[in-house]
Amino acid sequence: MKTGIKQVKLHVRKNDTVLVIAGNDKGKTGKVLRVFPQKNRVIVEGVNIRKRHVRPTQSHPQGAIIEREFPIHASNVKKS
């Protein structure tokens, strides 16, 4: 009986330049910053920007609203 995580292969890798082919950011290009093969998702630079609320910390004494990239499905991008 095998246990563990199934190895998934994606068509893109970190540092590849990709074109978004579907979704709100369709037509944008960017560099792949991170790949999540198990979830079939990638983070692309400058694509799918969302606002994240951060609690007060030493680096942000009053808290903050930070804009950052969130993952998109790998089927929505292609190499360019």
Swiss-Prot record:
Molecular function per GO: rRNA binding; structural constituent of ribosome
GO cellular component: ribonucleoprotein complex; ribosome
Top-level division of the source organism's lineage: Bacteria
SUPFAM superfamilies documented for this protein: Translation proteins SH3-like domain
CDD domains reported in the protein's UniProt record: KOW_RPL26
An individual GO BP term: translation
Gene3D superfamilies per record: 2.30.30.30
Chain coiled-coil ranges: none
Family according to the record: Belongs to the universal ribosomal protein uL24 family.
Subunit and partners: Part of the 50S ribosomal subunit.
Record function comment: One of two assembly initiator proteins, it binds directly to the 5'-end of the 23S rRNA, where it nucleates assembly of the 50S subunit.
Protein name: Large ribosomal subunit protein uL24
Taxonomic lineage: Bacteria, Pseudomonadati, Chlorobiota, Chlorobiia, Chlorobiales
